[in-house]
Every structure is written in structure tokens, then in C-alpha cells.
Amino acid sequence: MTIPIKESDPITVDVALGERSYDIVIGRGVLPSLGERIAALRPGARVAVVTDARVATHWLQRTEASLTGAGLTTSRIVVDEGEVSKSYAGVEFVCEELIKARIERNDLVVALGGGVVGDLAGFAAAIVRRGVDFVQVPTSLLAQVDSSVGGKTGINSPQGKNLVGAFHQPILVVADTAVLDTLSPRQFRAGYAEVAKYGLIGDEAFFAWLEVHHADIVKGDAAREHAVATSCRAKAAIVARDERESGERALLNLGHTFGHALEAATGFCGRLYHGEGVSIGMVLAAELSAQLGMIAAADVSRIERHLAAAGLPTRLQDIAGFRQEGLADADALMTLMAQDKKVRRGRLTFILLKAIGQAVVSSDVEPSMVRDFLARKLADAPA
């Protein structure tokens, strides 16, 4: 399938990290400019493009043409699609292929794909030869608005999501909104959960705009570019203030403590996409916030109503086979949440809501309260 690309004027968002600052270039039709942008940053570099089998069929040839057209030498590394590649075996494969391709420290890795490819390729770049620069070319909505920005890279452990990794900032992000036309409706919806997250954590006006325009984002063009750019600006500002997640950056994990546990409980097998887990997790976080007297019940209903209107799952029972594999066991979910990256001295850290657009970090929620909360949610779910 060939997607026609009608170029729009690109939007540039700066991630301000001093000497390690970089641009996020957003727009419909910006992919063909990738080669000249990279050549300006690293003239003469050899470039290894890491992608997955699905993305390769749509965008690898065009990406390589842009790179070679700018005088760059390329090689390709193609991995299997999905979370199965975000593993010890997956990163070993990519590292060995980079070494075989003789990628040196002054060369580049290009991550062409969604969140899995970006995390995997970025982590491999971080550790091969003790660090090779890389460029993110995100091809999913989730990657364009979240995982490609901020330098978090890594893989999953059998014990949990994203437990092995490194902070390794890209030197450039090129987000062509036209490539999102090749996503399945389910993949696009999963990415939309991360867009809604930005409204929930700090921008009620953006959330209200999304309630009106979420269908226009699916259609594309100006609404889609606005949503991606607004999300990237929000994340870039937080990353600039708290690169290593010592404080404010934790707000970006709204819904992720619950969501990552749900993903782990399904075995990262594709029954629950990351964004779908985040959607359910954000509703659970809002409901827990209401139980703690922090947010009005009307706001919780508004959040769930919007996510459901966008076609996202919002309840545990929305997960296929949710009564299997620990999904219907509050104690099993608590065990998985105990492996969350935000755990400090054995205590869970939750991102909770005081209102739509007002998120807070909380480390003083009693585990027994969370366990009872989950048990009630499971008991209320139909068999």
C-alpha cells in the first residue's frame, strides 16, 4: 500500500537539554527530508536503520532513499513486530547486527517504528560501543507523542515492563503524521490514550479540545498535527525540567502503574496494547483518586466517557480473557505493581488526579487500600 504524502509546513518543538538539546520535527510529509537533516548533523555517517517487519513494508524503502539521496551509507536491521522483540534476545540481536555492520561511535542508528522499535533500537544504541547517537522516526501515534521523546530506552523483563534500560537522548526526532495512515484502527486508538493523558495531567483546555476533535485527529491533517505537537510540547517541557524522572516527570506515568501490571499479566502477547493498558489504568487512577476524596465523581465519569468515545477500553473486563493469568487476582496484580520502576523503598508511587488537568505524585497510598480497591473492582466486574 502506497500512502500519498502531501507536505505541510513542519512544526518544530525544541527539547531544551543544553548541549544535548534536539528538535522534534512534526508534519505531514517530513519523512523525505530525513536524509538531509541527518547529513547536516552527521555528514558522512553510516546509518543503521532498525525497524520491524510491518513498518518495513510501508516505509523502509522511502527512508533508505532519503538517506542515500543525502549521501549517507545505510544498512538495515529488521525485527519481529510487537513486544516479543523488546526482550533480552531482541536487544542481543540488534547489538550483534550493529557490530556486524561496523557501526562506530560517530555513526548513527535510526529507529524507524513504533514504541517497541524506538525503545529497543535506542537501548542498543546506548550500549553498543558504550554509546552511539540515534534518531527517532516514530511511525505510531503512541511513539510520536510519547516514547520517541525524552530518552527513555529499554526492554521488558519476564518480571515486568521496561525494567532494563537506559536514558539515552536522540539527536533528532522526525514525526511524519502521514505515516499514521498505515496504522490499524486499534493501533491508532491505543496511541490516542497517551494524547489524552497530556490533557489529564496538566491541560484541561486541551482535554476539552480533544473531547470535541478526537474524530478529526483520526481523519488527519491539521487536527492530528495539532494534537501531536501539543503533546510533544508538553512532554518536552517536562523533560527539560526533569530529565531523569526525579520528580515532575513521574506525572507522565499517569495510568502506567496499573497499566504496566495489566500488560505483564497478559504476558505482553498482544491481547492488551500498551495504550489500552494505560487507558484502563488512567480510569483506575481516577477512581482511586475519587476514593481518596481528591477528584469529583463527575470528572471521573467525564474521563471514562471520553476514552470510551475514542474506542478505548476503560474497564478490566474489556480485556479479552481478563479472568485468566492473574488479571482477576488482586494479589497477583499487586505483586506485579511492586516491580514498577517508580517504587521507592518498597512503596508504590501513584499518579493521582485532583481534577482534570491537575495531577500529583503520591507515595503515601497504603498498599492494603489499593489491594482492597482492586478486589472491589474485580468483584464488580461481570463473570
Swiss-Prot record:
Its EC number is 4.2.3.4. Its main location: cytoplasm. Keywords: Amino-acid biosynthesis, Aromatic amino acid biosynthesis, Cobalt, Cytoplasm, Lyase, Metal-binding, NAD, Nucleotide-binding, Zinc. It is an enzyme of class 4 (lyase). The keyword Metal-binding applies. It is found in: Cytoplasm. SUPFAM superfamilies: Dehydroquinate synthase-like (SSF56796). It catalyses: 7-phospho-2-dehydro-3-deoxy-D-arabino-heptonate = 3-dehydroquinate + phosphate. Its cofactor is Co(2+); Zn(2+); NAD(+). The keyword Nuclease does not apply. Binds 1 divalent metal cation per subunit. Can use either Co(2+) or Zn(2+). Pathway: Metabolic intermediate biosynthesis; chorismate biosynthesis; chorismate from D-erythrose 4-phosphate and phosphoenolpyruvate: step 2/7. GO terms for biological process: amino acid biosynthetic process; aromatic amino acid family biosynthetic process; chorismate biosynthetic process. NAD(+) binds at residues 81-86, 115-119, 139-140, 152, 161. It holds the Pfam family DHQS_C. Zn(2+) binds at E194, H256, H274. One of its GO terms (molecular function) is metal ion binding. It comes from the Bacteria. GO terms for cellular component: cytoplasm. InterPro entries: Dehydroquinate_synthase, DHQ_synth_AroB, DHQ_synth_fam, DHQS/DOIS_N, DHQS_C. Belongs to the sugar phosphate cyclases superfamily. Dehydroquinate synthase family. NCBIfam families: aroB. Catalyzes the conversion of 3-deoxy-D-arabino-heptulosonate 7-phosphate (DAHP) to dehydroquinate (DHQ). This is 3-dehydroquinate synthase.
